[in-house]
From Swiss-Prot:
It comes from Shigella flexneri serotype 5b (strain 8401). Keywords: Cell inner membrane, Cell membrane, Membrane, Transmembrane, Transmembrane helix. The chain crosses the membrane at residues 5-25, 26-46, 63-83, 93-113. It is a multi-pass membrane protein. It is found in: Cell inner membrane. One of its GO terms (cellular component) is plasma membrane. It comes from the Bacteria. PANTHER family: HOLIN-LIKE PROTEIN CIDA-RELATED, UPF0299 MEMBRANE PROTEIN YOHJ. Belongs to the UPF0299 family. This is UPF0299 membrane protein YohJ.
Amino acid sequence: MSKTLNIIWQYLRAFVLIYACLYAGIFIASLLPVTIPGSIIGMLILSVLLALQILPAKWVNPGCYVLIRYMALLFVPIGVGVMQYFDLLRAQFGPVVVSCAVSTLVVFLVVSWSSQLVHGERKVVGQKGSEE
């Protein structure tokens, strides 16, 4: 019985922490003068807490595993909602594809530039350099 209660406690703690970050993000988003989704702010809060090791990762792991396992199921309502606008999407197919391609290219460029900025140029092991 004790093992069962321990497992229940681990899942309960994980979901309470995840939802606490979510609702903190929603609250902060309601105070901001700009429109930023509360779920994004909540995710950033959770990421900061995990990165600074204020919140141990083992506390949220059980809840994360459950959410990842059933992630495909969580996208079904979104897919059904998109199908309501199928005619509009078909009429605007070209601009949608172009905007997706351009935004993907912009993301690639920004990530590569910021990675280069953070990590700098590194010498490959075994590569001959100018230091001779």
